[in-house]
Amino acid sequence: MRHGKAHRKLGRTSAHRTAMFANMSASLIKHEQIVTTLPKAKELRPFVEKLVTLAKRGDLHARRQAISIVRDVEQVGKLFAAIGPRYKERQGGYIRVLKAGFRYGDNAPLAVIEFVDRDVSAKGKDSGPVYSNDSDD
């Protein structure tokens, strides 16, 4: 029987799941919208909503708790400086999950997970290293 099984395993070990959700939450905080599979998005939502609740508290202990979960100090800084104050008056429901069709190749159900009232200009900003096309060899 399936009593008391609160979360999906997603075919990963416990450590892999923890690391995956830490990385996905850092990406979601950075870009404020990401595309992933529907089961991952549904599991990520409470993970990030707890982080936003910590950011709304805003004290040093909450910041240290968020750093221990996300492990990306820069994104925790953004979480506490921009995202936490944005949702100060909202009592939960900071994340929206929208279905986005099926992935080509394995037909996996996709979803867009994003912050409600997100900053549209944050999407794709600083998404990786920039390589110049200079061929001065």
From Swiss-Prot:
SUPFAM superfamilies, A to Z: Prokaryotic ribosomal protein L17
Protein keywords: Ribonucleoprotein, Ribosomal protein
InterPro entries the record matches: Ribosomal_bL17, Ribosomal_bL17_CS, Ribosomal_bL17_sf
Gene3D superfamilies: Ribosomal protein L17
GO molecular function, one term: structural constituent of ribosome
Gene Ontology CC entries for this record: cytosolic large ribosomal subunit
Any Pfam family hit: Ribosomal_L17
A GO BP entry: translation
Protein family per UniProt: Belongs to the bacterial ribosomal protein bL17 family.
Subunit organization: Part of the 50S ribosomal subunit. Contacts protein L32.
PANTHER family (UniProt xref): LARGE RIBOSOMAL SUBUNIT PROTEIN BL17M, RIBOSOMAL PROTEIN L17
Protein name: Large ribosomal subunit protein bL17
Gene name of the record: rplQ
